């Protein structure tokens, strides 16, 4: 049986997280993003998490709370290519949303993310609303989609149920690999 766990990022996950990035770089990231990821791993701007499969980081992402705005910003959010379409991204997302709802300091209402046109539909399916589209919004020239999730429209109990459902679905999907 495969062990699947969401836990805080640890320095020992660094090589696995960089490998996740490298496996996705051509399709999802621009030039210079690896250096930014390395900076994030060295000094995270807020809590960071991994989804571990049999103890090895298979997905990574975190968030930071903005002191002067009523929002948190999701950063990164990627899964090893081998596990695409297995639900690790959804599990990681709902773990982060739940953590923000329960522990953000200061408490916050909105969770925002900026992402590519390729990934924006995933966030919309998970309850985010698109707030802006910026043609050439990334320095790489790619269009940027900004999306927002309103924590006031849900509850920690509802987020826990969504996280638990995502965990069960991911376990099922990985068990079929």
Q: Predicted regions: what is each one?
A:
Residues 26-50, 62:
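Active-site rim helix/loop that mediates acceptor-substrate recognition in acyltransferases
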Residues 66, 80, 84, 114-116:
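Residue-level recognition of the GNAT/N-acetyltransferase active site
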